[in-house]
Design a protein with these regions (language model features):
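Membrane-interfacial helix-loop connectors
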Residues: 17-53, 68, 72-87, 188, ...
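Hydrophobic alpha-helical transmembrane segments in multi-pass integral membrane proteins
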Residues: 63-68, 146-152, 198-217, 283, ...
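Small-residue-rich segments of transmembrane alpha-helices in multi-pass membrane proteins
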Residues: 4-11, 52-63, 121-128, 191-205, ...
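Juxtamembrane and boundary regions of transmembrane helices in multi-pass small-molecule transporters
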Residues: 40-46, 50, 62-63, 82-132, ...
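Long, contiguous bundles of hydrophobic transmembrane helices that form the permeation core
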Residues: 96-179
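Hydrophobic transmembrane alpha-helices of multi-pass solute/ion transporters
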Residues: 159-227
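Helix-loop-helix module between adjacent transmembrane segments
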Residues: 1-5, 10-23, 55-63, 91-99, ...
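Hydrophobic alpha-helical transmembrane segments
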Residues: 4-12, 26, 49-50, 85, ...
């Protein structure tokens, strides 16, 4: 069995799924499958999971609903699913090709080390056994497809992303009426309270003029050079998001880029927004703590007996992050300037 085609397939799958599903959920699923596969085919799951984590964050940057920062930026500035798909999605698509090539050669030696190991096909599980309830499987698949269609067409239908999210959640609850109590208990209320508090703090900073001071400082540093401003926003966002949660950072920076667009001649708010989006989404991929998906993925393989330290993680993640940001710079330069 050749492991490298599996690596490429899982990287693409991770990126595509993360365009529509939360990256944490995607990595929980793919990392578990990868660990299972590694035991069957006798290879280390570490390289494959690290590649999946990166591609999940990259895929999430392609759409408005892929990563929380994109939802915050898109909702605050009134952008649609199509706006993100045709802008950050273009960058993510080009970058994905480069990243697949990068990880293919970065991990080829490690994943090919055990290619002579004998594998017994009779030990492979039957995929159909994973579906415990076909009725629930069909219902959940239909709901998922409806959600994607509504998100893609929300600019045409006039429905907001928030309304679609709540409506789909209610439909899901109604189809699982017997388990509604259990589901409601599992809702992450701490995160909801966190977001409420976060936007109160950001609103306070905006009203007191702190964010305008930050915008003014960036404008002075750039000296009126709009492209330099875009690069500063993208790289600062990426570096900050590698060490701090990108959600509050994105929420804080939205008023800043609005102020910059209003006071700087030639500055396009949408370009600043997409630079912020790419920076916050991709920057978090550089370190094990930069994004929730990173923490979840490394935790899954650590529990399987394959601990991943900072050195192992950053050895490929930092160069991969730099590659994506450089591609983003080139695309932004040729498309908008």
């Amino acid at each position: 069995y050749k492991v490298m085609p599996i690596l490429v397939t899982f990287m693409i799958m991770s990126a595509v799924l993360s365009m529509f599903i939360d990256s944490i959920t995607v990595i929980l699923f793919l990392a578990a499958v990868t660990v299972e596969l590694s035991q069957l085919l006798k290879f280390s799951p570490v390289p494959m999971v690290l590649a999946e984590i990166f591609c999940a964050n990259l895929g999430g940057s392609a759409t408005m609903c892929g990563d929380p920062p994109n939802i915050i930026i898109g909702t605050a500035l009134g952008y649609s699913f199509a706006d993100f798909l045709t802008n950050t999605g273009l960058i993510a698509g080009i970058a994905l090709i480069a990243i697949i090539v990068f990880f293919f050669f970065a991990f080829k030696k490690e994943l090919s080390a055990n290619k002579n190991e004998k594998v017994d096909p009779s030990t492979f599980p039957n995929p159909s056994d994973a579906i415990e309830n076909k009725k629930d499987f069909i219902i959940s698949t239909v709901i998922f497809i409806i959600a994607i269609v509504l998100l893609v067409s929300h600019a045409q239908t006039g429905l907001t992303v928030a309304f679609i999210g709540v409506a789909i959640a209610l439909i899901t609850l109604l189809t699982s009426i017997k388990d509604i109590g259990f589901i409601l208990k599992k809702v992450d209320y701490k995160t909801l309270l966190f977001f409420i508090g976060l936007f109160i703090v950001v609103g306070g900073l905006e009203q007191t003029g702190v964010l305008e001071m930050i915008a003014s400082f960036i404008e002075k540093v750039c000296g009126g050079n709009v492209f330099a401003m875009v690069l500063i926003i993208m790289w600062i966002s990426a570096i900050a998001s590698a060490f701090v949660d990108n959600i509050p950072f994105a929420a804080t920076m939205v008023p800043v880029i609005k102020s910059l667009a209003a006071t700087t001649a030639g500055a396009d708010l949408s370009v600043l927004a997409y630079a912020l989006s790419v920076g916050t989404d991709i920057g978090g991929s550089a370190t094990p703590i930069g994004a929730s998906a990173n923490v979840v993925g490394t935790s899954v393989i650590s529990k399987a007996g394959h601990p991943v330290g900072w050195g192992k993680y950053c050895k490929t993640a930092i160069p991969a992050t730099a590659i994506v940001l450089i591609i983003a710079m080139v695309v932004i330069k040729f498309r908008y300037f």
